[in-house]
Structure formats: C-alpha cells, structure tokens
C-alpha cells in the first residue's frame, strides 16, 4: 500500500491504493511506506534530485522521510508478528520540503498530499525505533549537495 491512500481524491494512484485497502484481506499485513530515502534513491524522487542538483522547484509540502535501513527493520519485525491489515511505516516526523533547500522556485502542487506523517503506534508496540534521520543524512551528504547546489539549506 502507500501513505497516499489517506487522500484518495488527489490522484488515481492514491484512489487505487485506497480501494485496495478496502478489499477484504483476512490473512495479510500490508505496509504504507512513507518517503523512503537512501544514498542510491530512485531517480524520480526528491532525495535523488537534491543530491544530484536536479531540484526544479520546492513546495510547501511536508514529508515523513524514512531511511531504507529502517524500512528493512520494520519489515523484519512485521514478518515475525501476527499483525494483519495496513501498517504505516515511517518515522512519525514530518519535514517541510522548503526548509531543506532554498533558492529554487516555489510551486504549488495540488495533486500531492500536503503532509505525510506515519502513525507509528503499531510499529512502536513491536519495539520499532528508527535509527536514521533525514537531518543527519543530509548533513552527512552536505558536501555533495553543496557542490551541486550552492543554495541548499
């Protein structure tokens, strides 16, 4: 599933995810992954564009960024649990996109969610705790970003 299912009216992708969650799933656990990041992100994602100087615009949107290593830990926990139904996988913390990078054009993005923030109650009940955070990741990659975009941060 996806965190987009919370606002199915925004776009067809979100509507599809919402409908899939409404189907009966009596013996399944499925994850709503929030914005996953790593040093090798998908090329169409914000973090890739940020690390490679390809940011065309920023929005006022907020995202719950979760590192891929933490996603793996969440999957391992869920594999060994008896939980069923949808589970949010994220940090439970939203970060404003326009606070990450400055000096690029601003754009309103009405077809995107304004804010994503995982409800981590279920994962925390299993002992889940994120070890990575977006701020440290960005600071660790500061020199790369600074070379590509002198206006970042």
Roles of regions detected by a PLM:
Residues 11, 41, 45, 63-69, ...:
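Residue-level signal for the nucleotide or nucleotide-sugar donor/cofactor binding architecture
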